[in-house]
Amino acid sequence: MSKHFFLHNEFHWQGRHDAEDGAAGSRVHHVVQQIDYTHIGENPYGVALLGFACDAGVARNKGRIGAKKSPDLIRRALANLAWHSPHPLYDLGTVVCDDDLLESSQQHCAKIIAEVLPCVPVITLGGGHEVAWASFSGLARYFEQHHPEKAPKIGIINFDAHFDLRAFSSSQADVKPSSGTPFNQIQHYCQQQGWDFHYACLGVSKASNTRALFERAEQLNVWFVEDKDLGSVNHDYHLTQLQHFIDDCDYLYLTIDLDVFPAATAPGVSAPAARGVSYDNLAPFLDRILAHRDKLMLADIAEYNPTYDVDSQTARLAARLCWDIANAMNDKLEHQ
């Protein structure tokens, strides 16, 4: 148990061991190090993993709960993947949100991210997509503490079937922060700080977002591409648009909601997609983002819900995405 009451670090990393291969047979479970986040400065190279076990945001958004169980199951799927980098992974544990204590849990998560980012990049494992507000809050704290002299140009790239731009405050009692509000919260924060709001949402479903949400996205100048338009026919055009978006930003925050994938690929989510975007169609966009690893500071994977998974296939998808991102972040370290 971590000495921090809100942070659990009890996962036991284990997996296949091929003794005959020696060091060349390394897998994630061989190289991951479980450490206290306050000691991260003693470990200057690598990538940090942080869990965010939370159902509160999805429950508030009237969704199917179960994502609270996901961080350790993603870790389990990640453990056996081969590891080729000379740099390790650091497991900082999991921030656990009990009951409806969403806001305090998000602040705990943000605090850890802000303290770790000066040393290593971070991948957060949700939890519902309320993790995005926690992640961005940590990134914002980092800039406020270490680079207060200049407003950062942060590009937020969200692979998601939903805009997650719902209202988070209202005179109506049931309107409050949830898994459906994080990017509206981020926009509000940026407006208060005088920061530009650079938000891209790729894979959005017209069937799953009301006209009010599309109007909100247009009002905020969100660059979005619908799920039906992310096919291979349109790759070159949209990849060019993505490159322009990246070029206009100094830093990148990548967030992946697993419900962007078809239900057949990712059944284990709160809101499975009838259409979605195939991994093959999404991969060129992810690869383009990861090619700009020098700008990528932070990423998270959200909305895995093991209650509805089939043969752990969504867990394996989440683990592979985490693996891809972590390898790109470690490649950045090798080229510094």
Swiss-Prot record:
Species, as recorded: Vibrio vulnificus (strain YJ016)
Keyword Metal-binding found: yes
Q: How is the cofactor bound?
A: Binds 2 manganese ions per subunit.
State what this protein does. Catalyzes the conversion of N-formimidoyl-L-glutamate to L-glutamate and formamide.
Signal peptide positions (record) = none
Q: Which domain of life is it from?
A: Bacteria
Record bears the keyword Nucleotidyltransferase:
no
Q: Which reaction is recorded as catalysed by this protein?
A: N-formimidoyl-L-glutamate + H2O = formamide + L-glutamate
Cysteine disulfide links: none
Which family does the record assign?
Belongs to the arginase family.
Q: Which InterPro entries match?
A: HutG (IPR005923), Ureohydrolase (IPR006035), Ureohydrolase_dom_sf (IPR023696), Ureohydrolase_Mn_BS (IPR020855)
Q: Please name the GO terms that the record assigns under molecular function.
A: agmatinase activity; formimidoylglutamase activity; manganese ion binding
EC code: 3.5.3.8
Lineage of origin = Bacteria, Pseudomonadati, Pseudomonadota, Gammaproteobacteria, Vibrionales
Q: What's this protein's name?
A: Formimidoylglutamase
Keywords, alphabetical: Histidine metabolism, Hydrolase, Manganese, Metal-binding
Check the record and name the CDD domains matching this protein: Formimidoylglutamase (cd09988)
